[in-house]
């Protein structure tokens, strides 16, 4: 089984697609939410059909909001769910509608997950990537990264995020390792 360095490097290779439309310190605006999104996609894959069936059964009924989320979370066997018929494979299969479908896919998540992507202001980044003609490439490359817990256990996933965040911090503040003592600051 590959270690966290393998997956971190794989994700950094995808970040190279952002070069041009994004400066390196801005890569985290895309790479963190896309990594989270792909992980959630992989986690929910085994129960996708069950969640969709439960959503269809409950749709239009008396349950909505938190109550509906609770039932769908139970169907997913997680503290979150996605009731969209979309997933990364389906997104990859429709390049002409990638922006619309990606936004729709994110809106299919339970509120607790949608809040994460709202915090990232990710819809603006989706639009920016589409305008730069790299959205499909980024989604397609992430689709090829298997972040399922059977492949990447939670502890290893934590190390991947830690590695990515450390790398982004280094890009944001490249001079942090060069203290200015005396001469240059004075």
List each model region and its residues:
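Non-catalytic, mostly N-terminal accessory regions of nucleic-acid modification and defense proteins
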Residues: 1-186
